[in-house]
């Protein structure tokens, strides 16, 4: 009887320690709560932007008197536009204005290009952080012919189309490379009583840097 009583007393004394150990084991066995994952905000191409470009043009001027002349040279200017975005489709309007130093002579006839600009639609596909795009619209340029006796300068209107790749360098800085084909059609020039018919096509590669608002 005394032995049974001693066992009861010892068991009662150990009970708090057993409960504490069980509780500690239960706490340790609970899986850790995962930390919340912060999702970075999706970049949007929507909004206004502006920038500068530098390029090189390969031109072909067909004339009715001396045949083809190829006045190739550098060009530079500025561009600005506005994008809209729906899911991954990016679309908008863009304009550019610049100057071409293209000038070349053949058999006494010189063809010289000057101011040039365009107003175009643009549509691209968001592959964040890059966007391939297509563009097309109207174009204009000042083109001068000189045969040594007389010269005439005319502002020519035509069309332009091309494709490019734009890249997000930072949240606000954009980089791009673009190919453009432009055709200014046929125009007659009166040079000292001689009518010279001219057609000018240009192909150029441009690289640019822009700022997105």
UniProtKB/Swiss-Prot annotation:
Keywords (A to Z) from UniProt: Cell outer membrane, Membrane, Signal, Transmembrane, Transmembrane beta strand
Cellular component terms (Gene Ontology): cell outer membrane
Subcellular location: Cell outer membrane
Protein origin, superkingdom: Bacteria
One Pfam family here: OMP_b-brl
Primary residence: membrane
Signal sequence residues: 1-23
Alphabetical list of InterPro entries matching this protein: OMP-like (IPR051692), OMP/PagP_b-brl (IPR011250), OMP_b-brl (IPR027385)
Protein family membership: Belongs to the Omp25/RopB family.
The protein's name: 25 kDa outer-membrane immunogenic protein
Organism: Brucella abortus biovar 1 (strain 9-941)
């Amino acid at each position: 009887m005394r032995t049974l009583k001693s066992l009861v007393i010892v068991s009662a004394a150990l009970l708090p320690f057993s409960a504490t150990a069980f509780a500690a084991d239960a706490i340790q066995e609970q899986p850790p709560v995962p930390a919340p994952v912060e999702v970075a905000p999706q970049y949007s191409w929507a909004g206004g932007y502006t920038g500068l470009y530098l390029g090189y043009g390969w031109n072909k001027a067909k004339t009715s008197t001396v045949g083809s002349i190829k006045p190739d040279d550098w060009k530079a200017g500025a561009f600005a536009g506005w994008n809209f975005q729906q899911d991954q489709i990016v679309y908008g309007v863009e304009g550019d204005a610049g100057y071409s130093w293209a000038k070349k002579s053949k058999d006494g006839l010189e063809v010289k290009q000057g101011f040039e600009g365009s107003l175009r639609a643009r549509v691209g596909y968001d592959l964040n952080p890059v966007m391939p795009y297509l563009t097309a619209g109207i174009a204009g340029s000042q083109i001068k012919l000189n045969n040594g006796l007389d010269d005439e300068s005319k502002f020519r209107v035509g069309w332009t189309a091309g494709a490019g790749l734009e890249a997000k360098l930072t949240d606000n800085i954009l980089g791009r490379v673009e190919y453009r084909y432009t055709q200014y059609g046929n125009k007659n020039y009166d040079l000292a009583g001689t009518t010279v018919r001219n057609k000018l096509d240009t192909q150029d590669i441009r690289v640019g840097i822009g700022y997105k608002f």
